Amino acid sequence: MNSIPEGRPTPNLPRTANKRGVARLAAVQALYQMDVAGTGVMEVVAEYEAFRLGKEVDGTQYLDADPQWFRAIVAGVVEDQLKLDPMIHQALTEDWPLSRLDSTLRAILRAGAWELKARKDVPTAVIVSEYVDIAKAFYTEDEPKLVNAVLDRLALVIRGESRGAKPRHKS
């Protein structure tokens, strides 16, 4: 994983992004910052909107994002985290509890889970694909596959639809 000063994760070069895709990526970075630095939701949203989204930061040009989408994801994850985390935990394998995942992966899964739950207007395949792409921007190993499997299981539980995964059954 690449990083810039202050420990914020930065993605590898992604494919051409749309404004919602950029908002998703920024939301994951903001959620990471909140998790690692203990930054509050109002503070992190204000910082991203004032200094990051569509701006140049340390020689890197941030793309324009849909600010309402960004705010909705960040605020929604914060508001629903106590409901989302147990759902994510159930979708993980028993030997990988949510607490064992790094902050970036937790942020990706929380944002994806929130979107599956709250944004019924967005197709499941779009949500899963977008967050798998975000995972690919940060990771080169098995993490994107994990994101795909977990979000697919969550889609089955939340929406009753899936792209192929089966729900995890306890033995």
UniProtKB/Swiss-Prot annotation:
Signal peptide: none annotated. It holds the Pfam family NusB. InterPro entries: NusB-like_sf, NusB_fam, NusB_RsmB_TIM44. One of its GO terms (cellular component) is cytosol. Keywords: RNA-binding, Transcription, Transcription antitermination, Transcription regulation. GO terms for molecular function: RNA binding. GO terms for biological process: DNA-templated transcription termination; transcription antitermination. PANTHER family: ANTITERMINATION NUSB DOMAIN-CONTAINING PROTEIN, N UTILIZATION SUBSTANCE PROTEIN B-RELATED. Involved in transcription antitermination. Required for transcription of ribosomal RNA (rRNA) genes. Binds specifically to the boxA antiterminator sequence of the ribosomal RNA (rrn) operons. Belongs to the NusB family. This is Transcription antitermination protein NusB.
